[in-house]
Amino acid sequence: MRRLCGARIAAVLVQPADAGLAMSETRDHSWIGICLILAVMLQTIPAFSQEVRDQGSNAGEDFFRPPTNLFQLNTQYRTAPGSGPNGTIVNVTTGTIDFRYDHALDLAPMWILALRSDLPVLAKNPFSSDNPDRNYLYGVGDADVQAVLIHDLSQRLAVGFGARLIAPTGGDTFGSGKWQVMPIVGARYALWEISPSSYLEPFLRYDASFAGDPTRKNISNLQIAPTLNIGLPDEWYVSFYPSADIRINFGDPITGQTGRLFLPFDFRVGRKLDDGAALSFELGVPIIKDYPVYNIKTQVRFNQTF
């Protein structure tokens, strides 16, 4: 199309003036107008895509505006019910350091493929016949990889879908013992009326096990995150339900379970330190704990984009 337009415009510029060619000139001038409009459109499409990407640029906290590269160091502390001696229930404490790397690929204007990988290292004090004193044990947890395809419908609205694959690298002590697949779907709606960096970002995941140790519990639960992010002055922000901690369990019951629902109050507060780094703190406490995912959860995240 660009070659055709260029050839047509050149022909108009070099043709001799002739009154008998008035009708032809009119058609040629129309061609010039059409070519100019097409040229503007061709330049605008990638510019619009880049504007959408740049407007949501962040230090890694926005799922639908991923930076090109992200390294995250995530430290987490949580307690949850676990099996104790003689059928009792005890609180098991788990400390996690998660090493995460993300990479985003611009596939086409307004299309992004976001890739992610996680390698958790755990310390926990479960009760077992091999650990009757509940000493802390240390090891690698279940590693995972994730791919999500994101499409910007407009500067305000984006949608995405993908999946996460979790491998049972944590063994009996630090993992589920199961291969898991987790389909993901979500959307993002910018709330510019509040602030330029505010948005509503709900997403759903479904965690399901499909292979692994047959003696371990089968996993099948819906995970919900109705994320609301409020951008604050001086690069601060607060997010409500930033993690998919709302759970509905359809799989085998876990220790202490009396129903299917886990509903916490979960929030995160953070600040961008500079153009490429951010630090945040997250706290989750149960409201409804029929399906006891945790008694308390805290996270400190450091993000570095590059």
Language-model regions: role of each:
Residues 5, 9, 22-34:
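Bacterial N-terminal signal peptides that target proteins for export
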Residues 16:
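Cationic, low-complexity basic patches in intrinsically disordered or flexible, solvent-exposed regions
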